[in-house]
Amino acid sequence: MPTVLRVGSFRFHFYSHEPNEPAHIHVRNSDGECKFWIDPIQLAGNKGVAPHDVRQAERLVFEYQTLLLAKYHEYHRR
């Protein structure tokens, strides 16, 4: 599970084997984990992350979208 980025309490990472899903990023904090599709950006799931933290994570996904997408494709060789 490679970590791509850390910002504040958030860790942005991929799981190594999720072949049937579009480009996405998992975002974890101490409360749980949420997942965002990267292009276009959309919340794909949330397990325990407080709503205000989900919004903050989404803002960070927008801010780092280019990096996250590049790292996703680099890792998954697409």
Question: Where do the model's predicted regions map?
Answer:
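Negatively charged, low-complexity tracts enriched in Asp/Glu with abundant Ser/Thr
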Residues: M1-S9
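Alpha-helical interaction segments
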Residues: V4, Y15, H26, V54, ...
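Feature detects long, helix-prone N-terminal segments enriched in hydrophobes
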Residues: R11-H13
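A short, structured beta-strand/loop element
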Residues: Y15-P51
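C-terminal structural segments of small proteins and small subunits
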Residues: V49-R78
